């Protein structure tokens, strides 16, 4: 059986070659994280079979499959590998890419991947471009896996080498999906292994974000570089797959029925893919906001004529979601005729993630309403949840104001120098923090998944000076922080209404 030597821990990993020649031992590498500690060998069969799961752009799938499947059949025959591809339109969440699972020897995995990479590169440049990110999808800009990854200075690395996978042509990228345990081996202790991979290959290697408080089953490795650089990096990554007994634990090629969060295909931004599986139904999004409708809110200031294409689809998807859980579109002041509204809702059916679009639409509404000065008067109707408006007003004596924002006063807002990141701090009464956290912290996790923002709450007993309020810090892009702030505000408003209707719950 083919095996690979682990990198020994000697305190100086950077620059240590990764041996591709098979030694006689399968001893576990010391840099493996705790969750990779199991010795159960599930990645290989009796014939030294391993698994490699990669993403293939939909535009390149046809050339890989060939007419009537002839190309892929011939490829399997020549390499001895088994190749499975997700069905047409069955894309990896948040992308238009199909999932390909390759099973075979190490040589077969490398050969098949080399063929796939070549086919992707052969596509015309006007087709093989980086997937666009919707302006309605909030993204954070956190350094992947909190590892300070600088492009290594190496004879194989030049200024022309890709330094940012988000701006690199898809033709020069490789995307590999690995179990969380394998991701730990690829990173290594303190990031030593991934740095060694970059130094030896000249490629840029990044992993999708590792979330706090919840474990993803898989993570996505993005390799960016010239063909030979990528080939070398993939060989080194396959070596780590070879070393991990759990590397064959996630062999699904369809994510249509996967429950729970799925790793983002991009190395920056939220750890989670922009997928309906994170929040599978409109009802789930409604639950985050509380049971309500938007009756009586101020007119929505957006002008739909300013949007086209995918943006319009995302917006109409949001409208569809809003309508599905009782929001009255006529009260939004969108200026849509009955016929236009019907058409918009029909178009929304094609959306992959209407729940997230709805949250962003609400965030946009909150932003626009605030900019127009509608919150200046502190009236309950501005952000009131319709039927809860009166109940919210009834709590004014307890919280000190009519606006739900008063229960989450803004302490301060900071922007990064390039304007790509905001940090918003708000104060929330101690007895309302539980509404934001949810049972076992579930609500807080869902808010972060939905918006892409990072939300932190000060520890119990740590209050804003002179108050009994806890500090909530929201970090992310302007869109992400706005969406998260709005969700928190609406949740607090809902809780206020519930407590006003049931005074025994207060305190």
UniProtKB/Swiss-Prot annotation:
Residue numbers spanned by region Required for RNA binding: 419-503
Modified residues (Phosphoserine): 154
Protein name according to UniProt: RNA-binding protein Nova-1
Organism lineage string: Eukaryota, Metazoa, Chordata, Craniata, Vertebrata
UniProtKB keywords: mRNA processing, mRNA splicing, Neurogenesis, Nucleus, Phosphoprotein, Repeat, RNA-binding
Residue ranges of every copy of the KH domain listed in the record: 49-116, 171-237, 421-488
Residue interval(s) of motif Bipartite nuclear localization signal: 27-43
Predominant subcellular localization, coarse grouping: nucleus
Domain notes from UniProt: The KH domain consists of approximately 70 amino acids and includes a conserved hydrophobic core, an invariant Gly-X-X-Gly motif, and an additional variable segment. The third KH domain (KH3) binds a hairpin RNA loop containing the 5'-UCAY-3' motif on targeted molecules. RNA binding by KH3 requires residues C-terminal to the KH domain.
Species the sequence originates in: Homo sapiens (Human)
Known partners and oligomeric status: Interacts with PTBP2; the interaction is direct.
SMART domains found in the cross-reference section: KH (SM00322)
Tissue-specific expression: Expressed in cerebellum, brain stem, hippocampus, and frontal cortex.
One of the record's GO molecular function terms: mRNA 3'-UTR binding
KW RNA-binding (keyword) present: yes
Subcellular location: Nucleus
Region ranges (Disordered): 1-44, 139-171
GO cellular component terms attached to this protein's record: cytoplasm; intracellular membrane-bounded organelle; nucleolus; nucleoplasm; nucleus
GO biological process: mRNA splicing, via spliceosome; negative regulation of cold-induced thermogenesis; nervous system development; regulation of alternative mRNA splicing, via spliceosome; RNA processing; RNA splicing
């Amino acid at each position: 059986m083919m095996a690979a030597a682990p990198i020994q821990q000697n305190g100086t990993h950077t620059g240590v070659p990764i041996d591709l020649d098979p030694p006689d031992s399968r001893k576990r590498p010391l840099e493996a994280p705790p969750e990779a500690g199991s010795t159960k060998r599930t990645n290989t069969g009796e014939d030294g079979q391993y698994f490699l799961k990669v993403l293939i752009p939909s535009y390149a799938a046809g050339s890989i499959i060939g007419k009537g499947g002839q190309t892929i059949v011939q490829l399997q025959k020549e390499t001895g590998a088994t190749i499975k591809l997700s069905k047409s339109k069955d894309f990896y969440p948040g992308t238009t890419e199909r999932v390909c699972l390759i099973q075979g020897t190490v040589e077969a995995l490398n050969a098949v991947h080399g063929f796939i990479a070549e086919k992707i590169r052969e596509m015309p440049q006007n087709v093989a471009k980086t997937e666009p990110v919707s302006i309605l999808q909030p993204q954070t800009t956190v350094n992947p896996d909190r590892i300070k990854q600088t492009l290594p200075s190496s004879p194989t690395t030049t200024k022309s080498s890709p330094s940012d996978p988000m701006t690199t042509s898809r033709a020069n990228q490789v995307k590999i999906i690995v179990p969380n345990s394998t991701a730990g081996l690829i990173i290594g202790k303190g990031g030593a292994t991934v740095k060694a991979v970059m130094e030896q290959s000249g490629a840029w290697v990044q992993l999708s974000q590792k979330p706090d408080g919840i474990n993803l089953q898989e993570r996505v490795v993005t390799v960016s570089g010239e063909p030979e650089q990528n080939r070398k990096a993939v060989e080194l990554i396959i070596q780590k797959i070879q070393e991990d007994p759990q590397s064959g634990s996630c062999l699904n090629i369809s994510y249509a029925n996967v429950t729970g969060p799925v790793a983002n295909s991009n190395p920056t931004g939220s750890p989670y893919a922009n997928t309906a599986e994170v929040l599978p139904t409109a009802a789930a999004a409604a639950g985050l906001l509380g049971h309500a409708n938007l009756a009586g809110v101020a007119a929505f200031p957006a002008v739909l004529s300013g949007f086209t294409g995918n943006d319009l689809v995302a917006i109409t998807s949001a409208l569809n979601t809003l309508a599905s859980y009782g929001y009255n579109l006529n009260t939004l002041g969108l200026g849509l005729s009955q016929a236009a509204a019907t058409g918009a809702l029909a178009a929304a059916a094609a959306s992959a993630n209407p729940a997230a679009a709805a949250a962003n639409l609400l965030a946009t509404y909150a932003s626009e309403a605030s900019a127009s000065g509608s919150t200046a008067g502190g009236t309950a109707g501005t952000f009131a949840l319709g039927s809860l408006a009166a109940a919210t007003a009834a709590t004014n004596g307890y919280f000190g104001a009519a606006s739900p924002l008063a229960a989450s006063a803004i302490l301060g807002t900071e922007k990064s120098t390039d304007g790509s990141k905001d940090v918003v701090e708000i104060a929330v009464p101690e007895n309302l923090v539980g509404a934001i956290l949810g049972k076992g912290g579930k609500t807080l996790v869902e808010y972060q998944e939905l918006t892409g923002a990072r939300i932190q709450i000060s520890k119990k007993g740590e209050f804003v000076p002179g108050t009994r309020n806890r500090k909530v810090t929201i970090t992310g892009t302007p869109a992400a922080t706005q969406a998260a702030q709005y969700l928190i505000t609406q949740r607090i408003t809902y809780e206020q209404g519930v407590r006003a209707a049931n005074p025994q719950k207060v305190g």
